[in-house]
From Swiss-Prot:
Lineage, broadest ranks: Bacteria, Pseudomonadati, Pseudomonadota, Alphaproteobacteria, Caulobacterales
GO molecular function, one term: aminoacyl-tRNA deacylase activity
Annotated gene: leuS
Annotated family: Belongs to the class-I aminoacyl-tRNA synthetase family.
PROSITE patterns for this protein: AA_TRNA_LIGASE_I
Any Pfam family hit: tRNA-synt_1_2
Protein name, entry field: Leucine--tRNA ligase
Binding site for ATP: 630
SUPFAM superfamilies: Anticodon-binding domain of a subclass of class I aminoacyl-tRNA synthetases (SSF47323), Nucleotidylyl transferase (SSF52374), ValRS/IleRS/LeuRS editing domain (SSF50677)
Motif 'HIGH' region: positions: 43-53
Protein species of origin: Phenylobacterium zucineum (strain HLK1)
């Protein structure tokens, strides 16, 4: 038979059409059948796929195809996280309608995702900007509102005066808006919040049930929630207290054991006491204003230079009224953590130490490390670094001699006895601010009435949609500017009212979408029966950059919806996998301008690599390997790879290059290697011929036995590797087995070897299907496989064949290794003894000795006791 060349441009579309016609990936609720819900974090419709998308969705597709082959009822859906700022920016910059821009992008990306050959149930597709979706989200909002989980209050926010919107801390760079570059202002605005803090303990405690989540993600969430146990205590003023602060300064601390090491009390710039001081002191007011334009995120504040202002006020130490401490306003204290006030113990807190060194405040050690005998020994160490470890309390009166934990309890007991405070649990987690001053988002379904206050929209009036004639031509909230949309009547009294013009944070959109996929056409927000069948998501896949916010919000909303009876599960994602990024070398001209990889030719002479521009030959600087990004132009367009090598080669490369949790470095040589493998696979199947019927009982021979054993071992190894998310390892086993298939290819069509080879080829087609699905179908058809690979069961194997036929056993004489023998696997001790005594080398070692005992550990070792 003449060899045919594998042509992905013909093959891949053909099989995608066959899958569509067969509705091969439609999810079906099958009571009594095992279900499996695999979901990749849905994408923002930016307009084009990048290689990170290819890797992310290929990972999920491997799992979906594998589980389907194992006879699970599989749900593998796709949607679009479609609201958000980029669409409004496009509207302003290009004069396009954000809705049209978004749906055009969705159409392009949907076509690209379909080209990837993903086993997705497209009948469940939706975008969060679909009225059918965000209308149901508004119903959820009203449900939470009625349950007391939604409220509105004034809050200090980061305000971009150019874009005229609130910015998250992460969007403020060096005190400026990330997009506009304008200096950010601190403003008080009325904002909507969800009471996530009401679930703080559950969110921490339930992390221990998520044993299929990466430990690092669980730790990140635990730290973000920041549950800490300590004490609230009051420092009373020495002398006349400021008006309104007669009770003193309430401080929260996690280290009451270090109270005797206190050298100052600090308050946040936004603390009411700081505001009272600033009202009468222009210098204090100027310092506070400076703080407002400084670092905003906790991480930035942590690394920024510590600065303060001495208020001139003094407070009394709670354990010694004669001991007075100065009160400072400090830029590193957060108003929204604890009480917004601290006592500073420089010896045992690094921030306090940096502050004390700058302003000449005392540093008094009160915890002696276990390895130190004298307090004086640690004073020198405290010049630059605070001691925060365990130890024995010193210089602390009634606490002296106690260890740190015992001292904490004793200090809290004394504080409570004196009536100056009590033990307390505090969280870093704040309620979730969900207001956004943007029109391209989910409208918040409430109105403001002068007579009734805040009134929810009637459910019968949902969905509350955007006005058709909205204008996005300039910065700010287009809903606020609209001449008529915001004017309405109050659902309560029928009087005039105004609509809420803020929209919901897009994290709300992604906090429940996985539940909607259970039945996207349901009349209620969530079809509980369908959700009970499909949830939780068995395997969720996405980047670690979403470890905190998205995943935390989704966990919170799931618990809240369970409490209102909409869900039965309390955790949305049973398993979580965080994949690595796709990276590439960066290239720059001598001028510093970034250059795309396709414009560069790289040559190597020994270990020296040089790069030049294609065409001009201009030298190019080879930079670091970094995450693919448009800004550094080190991206590779997936369609360029698909056009040259086909989809399966691209999938194979991103899955085989490295373990999926690690970054994968893109290389042309790597994808070329994957393409060569695709062709080698096809060549093996193309060369195959149907064995002659009735010849399978012929003598097997060594080659046949070896092939059958390698076949069984490969099925076992690939299965275990997929189960363990070691996809690169699974592919490596397939590479090796292809070599075996080629080496053991029969010379004719008769005999056991021909039948064994044919059976191995059939299973090989099934084993490669999760990774290269189009190639698998073509190979399956080439050897006469019935139906589609996607409908075929996963291969099984005989465990006995995975054991080596022959075992090499070391032989010891009186405890020392003296040789080895080969014995059949599972051989009985008597048979092994005969082999040992017949071995010339062992016989020579035993010459002149009397054998007392031979001990055989089956398939492991032989011990001879001789004298």
């Amino acid at each position: 038979m003449a060899a045919t060349r594998y042509n992905p441009k013909e093959t891949e579309p053909k099989w995608r059409k066959r899958w569509d016609e067969a509705q091969a990936f439609r999810a079906v609720e099958a009571p009594g059948k095992r279900k499996y819900y695999v979901l990749e974090m849905f994408p923002y419709p930016s307009g084009r796929l990048h290689m990170g998308h290819v890797r992310n969705y290929a990972l999920g597709d491997v799992i979906a195809r594998y589980k389907r082959a194992q006879d699970f009822s599989v749900l593998h859906p796709m949607g679009w996280d479609a609201f958000g700022l980029p669409a409004e920016n496009a509207a302003m910059e290009r004069g396009v309608d954000p809705k049209a821009w978004t749906y055009d992008n969705i159409a392009r990306m949907r076509a690209e995702l379909k080209e990837l050959g993903l086993s997705i149930d497209w009948s469940r597709e939706f975008a969060t900007c679909d009225v059918e979706y965000y209308g149901q989200q508004q119903a959820l909002f009203l449900e939470l509102f009625e349950r007391g989980l939604v409220y509105r209050k004034e809050s200090v926010v980061n305000w971009d005066p150019v874009d005229q919107t609130v910015l998250a801390n992460e969007q403020v760079v060096d005190g400026k808006g990330w997009r506009s570059g304008a200096p950010v202002e601190k403003r008080k605005l009325a904002q909507w919040f969800l009471k996530i803090t009401q679930y703080a303990d559950q969110l921490v405690d339930d992390l221990k049930t998520l044993d299929r989540w990466p430990e690092k993600v669980r730790v990140m969430q635990e730290n973000w929630i920041g549950r800490s146990k300590g004490a609230r205590l009051r420092f009373r003023f020495a002398g006349q207290p400021p008006a309104g602060h007669e009770a003193g300064v309430e401080v929260y601390t996690t280290r009451p054991d270090t109270l005797f090491g206190a050298s100052f009390v600090g308050v946040a710039p936004d603390h009411p006491l700081a505001q009272a001081v600033a009202a009468a002191n222009p210098e204090a007011a100027a310092f506070i204003e400076k703080c407002r334009h400084g670092a905003v995120s906790e991480a930035e504040i942590e690394t920024a230079e510590k600065e303060g202002f001495d208020t001139g006020l003094k407070v009394k130490h709670p354990f010694d009224p004669s001991w007075e401490l100065p009160v400072w306003i400090a830029n590193f204290i957060l108003m929204d953590y604890g009480t917004g006030a601290i006592f500073g113990c420089p010896a045992h807190d690094q921030r306090d130490l940096d502050f004390a060194r700058k302003y000449g405040l005392p540093v008094k050690p009160v915890v002696l490390p276990p390895e130190e005998a004298q307090a004086e020994a640690i004073v020198q160490k405290l010049l630059n670094e605070a001691y925060t470890g365990p130890g024995r309390i010193i210089n602390s009166g009634f606490l002296d001699g106690l260890d740190v934990e015992a001292a904490k309890a004793a200090a809290i007991a004394r504080i409570e006895e004196q009536g100056d405070g009590q033990g307390a649990t505090v969280y870093r987690l704040r309620d979730w601010g969900v207001s956004r001053q943007r029109a391209w988002g989910c409208p918040i379904p409430v109105v403001h009435c002068q007579a009734c206050g805040v009134v929810p929209v009637r459910r019968s009036d949902l969905p509350l949609t955007h006005p058709a004639d909205i204008e996005f031509g300039k910065a700010g909230n287009a809903l606020e500017r609209h001449p008529t949309w915001k004017h309405t009547t109050c659902p309560g009294c029928g009087g005039p009212a105004t609509r809420e013009t803020d929209t919901l944070d897009t994290f709300v959109d992604s906090s429940w979408y996985f539940a909607r996929f259970a039945n996207p056409g349901a009349e209620a927000p969530i079809d509980k029966a369908a959700a009970d069948y499909w949830l939780p998501v068995d395997q969720y896949i996405g980047g670690v950059e979403h470890a905190v916010l998205h995943l935390l919000y989704a966990r919170f909303i799931t618990k809240a919806l369970a409490d209102v009876g909409m869900l039965s599960v309390r955790e949305p994602f049973a398993g979580l996998f965080t994949q690595g990024m796709v990276t590439h070398e960066t290239y720059r001209k001598q001028s510093g301008e970034w250059v795309e990889p396709k414009e560069v030719e790289v040559t190597a002479e020994g270990k020296t690599r040089r790069a030049r521009l294609v065409g001009s030959g201009e030298p190019v600087v080879i930079g670091d390997v970094e995450k693919m990004s448009k800004s550094k132009k080190n991206t590779v367009a997936p369609e360029e790879i698909f056009d040259v090598y086909g989809v399966d080669a691209a999938r194979l490369f991103v899955l085989s290059d490295s373990p999926p949790e690690r970054d994968a470095q893109w290389s042309t040589s790597g994808v070329q290697g994957a393409w060569r493998f695709v062709n080698r696979v096809w060549d093996e199947f193309d060369a195959s011929e149907e064995p002659v019927p009735g010849t399978e009982e012929a003598v097997t021979g060594v080659a046949t036995d070896n092939l059958r054993r390698q076949h069984a071992k490969t099925v076992k190894a690939v299965t275990e590797a997929i189960e363990g998310f070691r996809f690169n390892s699974a592919i490596a086993h397939l590479y090796s087995f292809l070599n075996v298939l080629k080496a053991e290819r029969p010379q004719g069509r008769a005999g056991a070897l021909a039948h064994a080879h044919r059976a191995a080829l059939r299973d090989f087609a099934l084993l490669i299907a999760p990774f290269t699905p189009h190639l698998a179908e073509e190979c399956w058809a080439r050897i006469g496989g019935q139906g589609l690979v996607v409908e075929a069961p996963w291969p099984t194997y005989d465990p006995a064949l995975t054991q080596d036929a022959v075992k090499v056993l070391p032989v010891q004489v009186n405890g020392k290794r003296r040789g080895e023998i080969s014995a059949p696997a599972g051989a009985e001790p008597a048979e092994v003894e005969q082999l040992v005594l017949a071995d010339p080398e062992i016989k020579a070692r035993l010459e002149g000795l009397t054998i007392r005992k031979i001990i055989v550990v089956k398939d492991r070792i032989v011990n001879i006791v001789a004298a």
